[in-house]
């Protein structure tokens, strides 16, 4: 089990992975996919930073990958192979991640069987300066789809309710019912 999986099952919302992974042909696409997949499996934010130009040698080349993913979505990525320092910025919606974990029974079940480790909790305060603006849009209604997705969601809710009511009526041997 990857350490990031264990950490998220202990309650971590964001994984910070500091790496010294060298470059190989085709490795970057695999790495990007792996980070997005792991952030989805963990229902977490995943911040990856790898060694850069200054750490390269005659034997190994480091591209200086910086990747930020959230629950399977690539949010931001730094340019590779630069000789300059890189700064990658994005927001990770912790409240949405925590909600997703609460409603996902597989995630909650997975956490119940873990031996309780002594996880270190780090409290911190974020100070927002004047003129601060987000780098990505934040949906004010993240749990309510729109357009065609809303129609599909409502139909799904309706069919779930109908199936539940039908099962109850069969179980109660009801010959008639008034629904209103």
Can you say where each PLM-predicted feature lies in the sequence?
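Short acidic (Asp/Glu) and glycine-rich catalytic loops that position anionic groups and cofactors
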Residues: 15-18, 137-141, 173-174
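Domain-wide signal for the mature, well-folded portions of proteins, strongly enriched
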Residues: 1-3, 77, 97-100, 167-172
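CN hydrolase (nitrilase-like) catalytic-core segments centered on the catalytic cysteine
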Residues: 2-89
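Catalytic P-loop NTP-binding/switch module of NTPases
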Residues: 86-151, 155, 159-160
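A phosphate-binding catalytic loop at a beta-strand-loop-alpha-helix junction
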Residues: 157, 161-180
């Amino acid at each position: 089990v990857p350490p990031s999986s264990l950490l998220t099952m202990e309650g971590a919302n964001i994984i910070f992975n500091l790496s010294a992974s060298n470059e190989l042909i085709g490795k970057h696409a695999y790495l990007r996919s792996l980070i997005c997949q792991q952030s989805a499996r963990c229902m977490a934010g995943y911040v990856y930073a790898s060694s850069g130009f200054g750490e390269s040698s005659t034997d190994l080349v480091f591209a200086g990958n910086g990747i930020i993913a959230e629950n399977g979505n690539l949010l931001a990525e730094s340019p590779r192979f630069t000789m300059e320092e890189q700064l990658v910025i994005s927001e990770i919606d912790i409240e949405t991640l925590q909600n997703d974990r609460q409603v996902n029974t597989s995630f909650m079940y997975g956490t119940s069987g873990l031996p309780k480790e002594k996880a270190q909790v780090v409290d911190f305060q974020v100070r927002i300066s004047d003129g601060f603006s987000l780098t990505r849009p934040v949906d004010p209604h993240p749990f309510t789809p729109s357009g065609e997705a809303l129609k599909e969601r409502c139909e799904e809710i309706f069919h779930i309710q109908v199936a539940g009511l039908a099962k109850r009526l069969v179980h109660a041997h009801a010959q008639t019912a008034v629904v209103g």
